């Protein structure tokens, strides 16, 4: 013979509410601990826990009078309490669904952007490596450049190009100064001062 299954927590809560609705009476805990096992099959040891859960959910009212707690519940209030509870649960469900949707979007966005992020990280790493290599090469070049004939020749050629360019600009400046003196009658010293041209400004030999 199979063992009889005990009541679930929700079944105990439902049967406890039936006691209040059917009797429309006010009870103390000790009264319910006697009545609930007999009328509804709720074990006396679980009455207090079930009762407290109903009080916490606003289904049952509790008032302390003197040294005793008194419990009661009316169908209309229980209905409103259930309605509020249902609304709260629906609200939580809606919020949960929205959070899930937002999270899903974030995941998809992260997936889309992951390749770019990885590529940027890889490029940044390569760039850093190239910079390090460049610094090392520059240091090596500095050590040997003074005794490298090719480097010396390149430096001479670069100096020659720079000298020619500087003298071309010198030509231009002298031409502008000459034009300004003829056109506006400016003194050469004032032109030099206004344009920051040094007194010893001349061609490079």
From Swiss-Prot:
Location in or out of the cell: Nucleus
Entry's Gene Ontology cellular component terms: nucleus
Coiled-coil spans in chain: 83-173
An individual GO BP term: reciprocal meiotic recombination
Protein origin, superkingdom: Eukaryota
InterPro entries on file: LZ3wCH, Mnd1, Mnd1_HTH, WH_DNA-bd_sf
GO molecular function: double-stranded DNA binding
Keywords assigned by UniProt, alphabetized: Acetylation, Coiled coil, DNA recombination, DNA-binding, Meiosis, Nucleus
N-acetylserine, modified sites: 2
Keyword Nucleus: yes
Subunit record text: Heterodimer with PSMC3IP/HOP2. MND1-PSMC3IP interacts with DMC1 and RAD51 and binds to ssDNA and dsDNA showing no preference for either form of DNA.
Function: Required for proper homologous chromosome pairing and efficient cross-over and intragenic recombination during meiosis. Stimulates both DMC1- and RAD51-mediated homologous strand assimilation, which is required for the resolution of meiotic double-strand breaks.
Protein name: Meiotic nuclear division protein 1 homolog
UniProt organism field: Mus musculus
